Design a protein with these regions (language model features):
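Helix-start (N-cap) detector for alpha-helical repeat units in TPR-like alpha-solenoids
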Residues: 56, 104-105, 148-149, 187-188, ...
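Terminal, low-structured helical/coil segments at or just beyond the last alpha-helical repeat
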Residues: 170, 188-195, 199-233
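Short coil/turn linking the two alpha-helices of tandem helical-hairpin repeats
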Residues: 31, 68-77, 111, 116-125, ...
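Conserved structural position within tetratricopeptide repeats
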Residues: 46-51, 91, 95-98, 138-142, ...
């Protein structure tokens, strides 16, 4: 019995390590905006998940890849592509949660994907995905209140959600600062803090935040683009 437990623990640790390595690879593709490679990875991971449909982590990995693909599509201003990838990923994240409702990051990824539909298709996105995004991200924070990524995703959701729906940059900035407090070297949190500050016309502070983001992730093309587009004052 002890050997079985040790074997299971080893396999679980190996699976988590493989997932972390895959996520790092996807982040590198995201940083250089290699959308074709991200979409290829997402399609391949979705296909692999279909072959092992009872593996929640397989669906989760596919959802993560779709999220990065949607993110880059939005960065290069392809709203249709962003919506397509986000909706495909949300469906995979739902399957992961149906198999394992105990993983906080599954909810974080679902909320992120639902939130990514909103800037791609604001009216339909808010009506069809706004509530789902908020509920999933609230759940992720409830389950793991020390997750910087969950607060970051929650803040991005607020950033894209209109103020009359409870969103806006003020609420987003609070979440981004919480994420930074939990993970001071989070390049993504500093990036989004800079974007939100720029929206509030706090350009000097925005540039400082964007520069901080580049300090932690100098390869991120979109961060450099945002910094270049932000005036000094």
């Amino acid at each position: 019995m002890g050997k079985v437990r040790i074997g299971f623990t080893f396999m679980l640790a190996f699976s988590l390590a493989a997932t972390a390595m895959a996520a790092d690879d996807l982040e590198k593709l995201r940083d250089r905006q290699d959308r074709a490679a991200l979409e290829s990875h997402a399609t391949a991971l979705h296909g692999a998940a279909e072959k092992t449909p009872n593996d929640a982590n397989g669906w989760y990995r596919a959802a993560v890849a779709y999220s990065y693909a949607a993110e880059v599509a939005m960065e290069v201003k392809d709203k249709n592509g962003a919506q397509k990838n986000a909706e495909a990923g949300a469906a995979d994240a739902e399957k992961a949660i149906a198999l394992n409702s105990k993983a906080a990051d599954y909810y974080r990824v679902l909320g992120t994907l639902c939130g990514e539909v909103i800037p791609a298709n604001p009216i339909a996105g808010i009506l069809s995905y706004g509530k789902r995004a908020k509920e999933a991200l609230d759940k992720a924070i409830e389950m793991d209140p020390k997750s910087a990524k969950a607060f970051l995703a929650h803040g991005v959701g607020y950033y894209y959600l209109p103020t009359n729906f409870g969103g806006g940059p003020d609420n987003a900035i609070k979440d981004f600062r919480r994420a930074i407090a939990l993970e001071p070297r989070s390049a993504d949190a500093w990036l989004w803090l800079g974007i939100a500050l720029k929206k509030q016309h706090q350009n000097a502070q925005a540039r400082a935040a964007l520069a901080k983001s580049l300090q932690f992730d100098p390869e991120r093309l979109w961060t450099r683009d945002q910094l270049d587009k932000t005036p000094p004052q």
